[in-house]
Amino acid sequence: MGAVAGPEIERLVQLLARLPGLGPRSARRAALHLIKKREALMMPLSSALQVALDKVQVCKTCGNIDTQNPCTVCTDPKRDPAIIVVVADVADLWALERANATQGRYHVLGATLSPLDGVGPQDLTIDALVARAHAAEVHEVILALNATVDGQTTAHYITDLLQDANVKVTRLAHGVPVGGELDYLDEGTLSAAMRQRTLF
């Protein structure tokens, strides 16, 4: 069976299919929707993508992405400079910001240690984190890393490196999510929740 659309449209579909969460069928539907909504959607999207391409950059202080450098989080005077929240990637930073979970500042590692994937300490921004943690104003480093083997390995590695820094190193609690039912949780989550129980 031959191509259904011209090469330009097929190229659009192929590019959309590279996005996370979009397979070939979803990409084709998205492309059709964009084409049908050319004025209302495709043109503003094209403009926004061009602005992002021209202006978005990585913050030299924390690793966030923004249109200014240092980013708006790092330059916000309401942020507590005594707290650094360590995350694996920008998506985690954005999740914490949506939850309004902290008024501290961030440090984006870029990933977690993963020997199986060939990701070592030299591939992450751990050296910059250690340097920031040694600043006189920093009193706490919060490890907001995923509760995976790679996340825990990274947390232990960072904790060891920060032993000589005059900072408290904490990590996010792991356990029962809000609205979670015990019967649906895995054994590891239940064990972590039981170990990290708090007074009520």
Curated annotation (Swiss-Prot):
Q: Which Pfam families match?
A: RecR_C, RecR_HhH, RecR_ZnF, Toprim_4
Domain named Toprim: which ranges? 82-177
The lineage's top-level taxon is Bacteria
Q: Which CDD domains match?
A: TOPRIM_recR (cd01025)
Q: Does the keyword NADP apply?
A: no
Recorded GO molecular functions are: DNA binding; zinc ion binding
**Residues in the signal sequence:** none
**Classification via Gene3D superfamilies:** 3.40.1360.10, 6.10.250.240, RecR Domain 1
Alphabetically sorted, this entry's keywords are: DNA damage, DNA recombination, DNA repair, Metal-binding, Zinc, Zinc-finger
Q: Which residues form a coiled coil?
A: none
Q: Name one GO biological process term.
A: recombinational repair
**ZnF (C4-type) intervals:** 59-74
Its annotated function is as follows: May play a role in DNA repair. It seems to be involved in an RecBC-independent recombinational process of DNA repair. It may act with RecF and RecO.
Q: Which NCBIfam families match?
A: recR (TIGR00615)
Q: Which family does it belong to?
A: Belongs to the RecR family.
Q: Would you tell me the protein name for this molecule?
A: Recombination protein RecR
